[in-house]
Amino acid sequence: MLSTLIKKMFGSRNERTLRRMEKSVMAINAFEPKMQALSNEELAGKTQEFKERFNNGESLDELLAEAFATVREVSLRTLGLRHFDVQLIGGMVLHEGNIAEMRTGEGKTLVATLPAYLNAISGRGVHIVTVNDYLAKRDSQWMKPIYEFLGLTVGVIYPDMSHKEKQEAYKADIVYGTNNEYGFDYLRDNMAFSLTDKVQRELNFAIVDEVDSILIDEARTPLIISGAAEDSSELYIKINSLIPQLKKQEEEGDEGDYTIDEKQKQAHLTDAGHLHIEELLTKAKLLDPGESLYHASNIMLMHHVNAALKAHAMFHRDIDYIVKDNQVVIVDEHTGRTMPGRRWSEGLHQAVEAKEGVPIQNENQTLASITFQNFFRMYNKLSGMTGTADTEAYEFQQIYNLEVVVIPTNRSMIRKDEADLVYLTQADKFQAIIEDVRECGVRKQPVLVGTVSIEASEFLSQLLKKENIKHQVLNAKFHEKEAQIIAEAGRPGAVTIATNMAGRGTDIVLGGSLAADLANLPADASEQEKEAVKKEWQKRHDEVIAAGGLRIIGSERHESRRIDNQLRGRAGRQGDPGSSRFYLSLEDNLMRIFASERVASMMRRLGMQPGEPIEHSLVTRAIENAQRKLEGHHFDVRKQLLDYDNVANDQRQVIYTQRASIMAMTDTQEVVEMMREEVMNSLVDTYIPPQSLEDQWDPQALSDVLSDEFKIKAPVPDWIDKDHSIQPDQIKEKVLALAIEHYDEKVRKVGRPVISQFEKSIILQTLDNHWREHLAAMDQLRQGIHLRGYAQKDPKQEYKKEAFSLFTMMLDNLKYEVIRILSSVEIQTEEDAQVVEEQRRADQIRKMNLMHESLSENDEASETQTFRRQEKKIGRNDPCPCGSGKKYKACHGSLV
């Protein structure tokens, strides 16, 4: 009651925003006479003037009125379109980083030119986001004359472009493209191997068209780049046949090709084993004669040998795994239960499959992924346009910190929205729809019938065919053809069936598309021919208006009121007449699940008979309440997915920041030295624990690992025999000194610049491999974490804790692997260093797949929390996003 009183006194928030912006509209209009007086050259020169003023300290807000007036005048001169006052308000809403709700036909494409031009003045780029490639190309071509007149460049991105073409497109001041393409390019950039491979600039300002579709309907669908996790099965089979020829070393000093470390569950080749496996690989034609397994070009081969050795020496059938239905199934070492669907990483599972002679599965593995929620929140400023956002205003505010401003229509809306008709059965409902369509045909009124699924649209099409009613069907499959059909859906007597999302972005013009008719004329058509086409169109236009405008028929209520409103919004554009009605039945999904009992009891009380409908405001209200419940449920699911994805997103930011930092380095010496010290100290701590007695030490095992894994000869037992008072810290110093000396020899052979490039390649390659494995581990953790709820634990907190532990382990393993490879690989020439980068590029491109996959909805609901847009850069002294409480430089920033 109090809020109602305040609204009456001061107006709603939306009304106050509009009143504030009306003052700016007056300022823009005041500039109009001045702009009209300028020549084309003077008007085009305004852009340079604005850039200079911006560089001299004026803000974009201060330039807004004059810049908007400039765009309006240029639009009139180039396209013959003058922005209405309400379109100026829409442009201001977008510039302020909010969502403009504008009805269908109010010119959203033209509105976007205002904030796009203003923000392009800063030189930092503007991304205009569309729902499909057709709209990206169409809108960029349509609006290009405005931008080019003003001296700005326009780019458009689409999937089939070459790398160079895409780089050029992103350099443009204003770029058009789809949400998928922007997202995939971001992920690909963060898998790039050098800064020159990247295509995107900073994510500065995004204007998202059909923002509800992209930020809400697709919010649960992550973008995924996947690739083949390992090489072909043939290599596994060949290497598997060699391993049984190797002999285990039973005791220290005995002959043998490999040793096993039960404690660490590892198997290591001895010096003799290295020579033996090289001979075997050479005979198998997997290694060139005289070539070392540790040569830079054989890193992947070495990886396969290690996996196969481990599979034979450390993993035993009916203990670590069983073979069932021709598949290797892991046995949980703690519970003894089988774990179907789980697979060991780093090629080990394939090596075990080769050992057991079962089919080797070349699994697709996630290389990189991100949700639209987290991608679009990375932009410095985000805004959006749609015809229907107000019903989702709370979600836009909570998740994206975006306010929805409802923009008034330029002309009053006179569409008649009729009450729903509810039938007992679907058969009755469809019969009523057919009758409505037939009646419209008699009076030549065009009809658009909306369905919730492709299956329903095809079923309705069959019914219309039986009745010999001509019609077109749209299934949102072919966007260009779809736009043509939608453009003609306003012709007299036209009948079009469309799934609710089909044809978004294209207006239905009463009488059909005049532009399409003119475009069909020959290039040398006379003015008389053009005039005849215009007269014919006007006649059709008047005929449709006399018949009542476009008729919208909904065959079922959607789960979201917003989608229903989108369908209704197809009619009544720019003050045109029109009408809409939804036909429902108690057998519809929404009614059956949520509203059937209440509505059915109403129908029984009213004595309804089969074939008779019920039309009552109470019924409509009951249905809308059901939709609200469902919208709330979907919001909770999206919110919960975001809560979980934010954990992965924080880690993604750390990894991508480190990656970018390493790529930008010219010398990686400091990073490698830091890693080496950490790895060597950690190794010593493992075998010679601090604060422990000498009896608990295992110096021989430490010496073996340093020799086998890092090719460092460290006689640790001799040091202890010679000096029993030696301390673990002194052993660390000696081990580190030997590691440095061993590595410095490699540096002296090829020089610091070459070794730096090699180090960078190895770090990036290893980082990518471990990040890929980490994503798989996070996915497995996510799938089972809800079970913690049965133990009275908060699954979300447990997930954060476990994810942090996995992330820390991944970084430790990463450092270990980098130092192991750098220490053991032989580098003789500059070419050896370059071959690693070439291998990495080829491996990354091979079988890379782009996916846009739905996530499971079987997730527990989670508590809500407000999320703000993320900053892109993490400062060295900022808290680490992983949640440890440490500074970034002292935690996960230590790698860079």
From Swiss-Prot:
Q: Where, by residue number, does ATP bind?
A: Q87, G105, E106, G107, K108, T109, D507
The cross-references to CDD domains, in alphabetical order and at most eight, read: DEXDc_SecA, SF2_C_secA
The UniProt subunit note reads as follows: Monomer and homodimer. Part of the essential Sec protein translocation apparatus which comprises SecA, SecYEG and auxiliary proteins SecDF-YajC and YidC.
HAMAP family in the cross-refs: SecA
Q: Which cofactor does it need?
A: Zn(2+)
**Protein name per Swiss-Prot or TrEMBL:** Protein translocase subunit SecA
| EC annotation from Swiss-Prot or TrEMBL | 7.4.2.8
Is this entry keyworded Transcription? no
Using the UniProt annotation, give all residue ranges assigned to the region (Disordered): 853-879
Q: Where does Zn(2+) bind?
A: C880, C882, C891, H892
An annotated Gene Ontology molecular function? metal ion binding
* Keywords of the record: ATP-binding, Cell inner membrane, Cell membrane, Cytoplasm, Membrane, Metal-binding, Nucleotide-binding, Protein transport, Translocase, Translocation, Transport, Zinc
This protein's gene is called secA
Here the segments flagged for biased composition (Basic and acidic residues) are 866-876
Q: Which free-text remark accompanies the cofactor?
A: May bind 1 zinc ion per subunit.
Q: Where in the cell is it found?
A: Cell inner membrane; Cytoplasm
Membrane topology of this protein? Peripheral membrane protein
Per the entry, what this protein does is:
Part of the Sec protein translocase complex. Interacts with the SecYEG preprotein conducting channel. Has a central role in coupling the hydrolysis of ATP to the transfer of proteins into and across the cell membrane, serving both as a receptor for the preprotein-SecB complex and as an ATP-driven molecular motor driving the stepwise translocation of polypeptide chains across the membrane.
InterPro entries per the record?
Helicase_ATP-bd, Helicase_C-like, P-loop_NTPase, SEC_C_motif, SecA, SecA_CS, SecA_DEAD, SecA_motor_DEAD
Q: Does the keyword Translocase apply?
A: yes
In this record, what's one Pfam family?
SEC-C
Species of origin reads Legionella pneumophila (strain Corby)
Sorted alphabetically, the Gene Ontology BP terms of this entry are: intracellular protein transmembrane transport; protein import; protein targeting; protein transport by the Sec complex
